[in-house]
UniProtKB/Swiss-Prot annotation:
Keyword Membrane: yes
MF (Gene Ontology): chlorophyll binding
Protein name from the UniProt record: Divinyl chlorophyll a/b light-harvesting protein PcbG
Xref: SUPFAM superfamilies: Photosystem II antenna protein-like (SSF161077)
Keyword Signal: no
Keywords on record: Chlorophyll, Chromophore, Membrane, Photosynthesis, Photosystem I, Photosystem II, Thylakoid, Transmembrane, Transmembrane helix
Subunit organization: The antenna complex consists of divinyl chlorophylls (a and b) and divinyl chlorophyll a/b binding proteins and binds more divinyl chlorophyll b than does the antenna complex from high-light-adapted Prochlorococcus.
UniProt cross-references to Pfam families, sorted A to Z: PSII
Positions of transmembrane segments: 27-47, 65-85, 88-108, 201-221, 241-261, 308-328
Job description of the protein: The antenna complex functions as a light receptor, it captures and delivers excitation energy to photosystems II and I. The Prochlorales pcb genes are not related to higher plant LHCs.
């Protein structure tokens, strides 16, 4: 984190990431703990939505975000193809049990294992130490992350191919073979909001899996070419810089997801998420429902699509502000100068020379 040259800098309790900045073991513990929280929230929220689900009202009008996502990937349907919530409780309970496993892993890494992997038990462990101004170290860790993302894409593609996912074009769950047409994949970079068939959606995921796993292997196996210069980030690459990159990525993905969710009914089927939205502008952009949802059981009476879209957009917006904040700090700007300048306005004096 940015210390402005102070080797003994301290952070408030709210700056939780600061205590794991240079300690990869603690960083892993934090990752596992966060994953456990997410898994528990997903499982518990799914059970809550299932308990309050009213089959007489469209799912998209009940703000059932977790149920809607499960229905989209073909979970919860009976043998007749009707969504009844079958097996949904089992999925939720598995997530809750998994959260306990993640919590155990977090506590183990936090309390029992080395906080700094540079002192780890073997050379393999030590490769994952955190050296923020060492591009070879960071690219090695990045490579493993990319491979995990690629494996997740493969899992989704295979799930759709073997089990099947919901296709709004026919109103039923079906098995989907991915379309690995590179021309379509390239063109969908620019019109992805208009994708209207699942084959192209799965083809994009299959292509991403290849790119991410190939890129991951490349980053693990290679080191930088030539001297590590300022042009390549020397003196700038830091924990704060990497944090800013991460915030930019997740912020951009959230905003893209908001636009996609607002209008696309192939990836976000209308029966589960509600009708497409209309974009409006006030103090900031926002999306509103285009149909009457007076029977909605959701808080404030909106569709699932409206809730999901607006929350994604505003989270994405604030993540991007966080990106700018941390990126500017990583470049060396001291925001305390702004605070001091504002605080000194009442003491400022203007001298006019003849």
């Amino acid at each position: 984190m940015q210390t402005y040259g102070n080797p003994d800098v301290t952070y408030g309790w709210w700056a939780g990431n600061s205590r794991v900045t240079n300690r990869a073991g603690k960083f892993i513990a934090a990752h596992a703990g966060h994953t456990g929280l997410i898994s528990f929230a997903a499982g518990a929220s799914t059970l809550w939505e299932l308990a309050r689900f009213d089959p007489s009202i469209a799912m998209g009008h009940q703000s059932s975000i977790f149920l809607a996502h499960l229905a989209s990937i073909g979970i919860g349907f009976d043998d007749a193809g009707v969504w009844t919530g079958a097996n949904v409780a089992s999925v939720a309970i598995v997530h809750i049990i998994a959260s306990l496993v993640y919590a155990g892993g977090a506590l183990s890494h936090s309390l029992l294992f080395d906080g700094d992997l540079a002192d780890g038990p073997g050379p393999t462990t030590q490769k994952f130490k955190l050296e923020w101004d060492n591009p070879d170290n960071l690219t090695f860790i990045l490579g493993h992350h990319l491979i995990f993302f690629g494996v997740a894409c493969i899992a989704f593609v295979e799930w759709a191919r073997i089990h099947g996912i919901y296709d709004p074009a026919i109103g039923a769950v079906r098995q989907v073979e991915y379309n690995l047409n590179l021309t379509n994949i390239w063109n969908h970079q620019f019109d992805f909001l208009a994708i209207d068939n699942l084959e192209d959606v799965l083809g994009g995921h299959a292509f991403l899996a290849f790119v991410e796993i190939t890129g991951g292997a490349f980053h693990i196996a290679t080191k930088q070419v030539g001297e590590y210069t300022e042009f390549k980030g020397a003196g700038i690459l830091s924990a704060e810089a990497v944090l800013s990159f991460s915030l930019a990525g997740i912020g951009w993905m959230a905003i893209v997801a908001a636009f996609w969710c607002a209008t696309n009914t192939t990836v976000y089927p209308e029966p589960w998420f509600g009708e497409p939205l209309a974009l409006k502008f006030g103090i900031s952009p926002y999306w509103i429902d285009t149909v009457e949802v007076s029977e909605s059981t959701a808080l404030a009476g909106h569709t699932t699509r409206a809730a999901l879209t607006n929350v994604h957009y505003y989270f994405g917006f604030f993540f991007l502000q966080g990106h700018l904040w941390h990126a500017i700090r990583a470049l060396g700007f001291d925001f305390r100068r702004v605070t001091n300048a504002v605080a000194g306005l009442d003491r400022a004096q203007i001298t006019l020379n003849d």
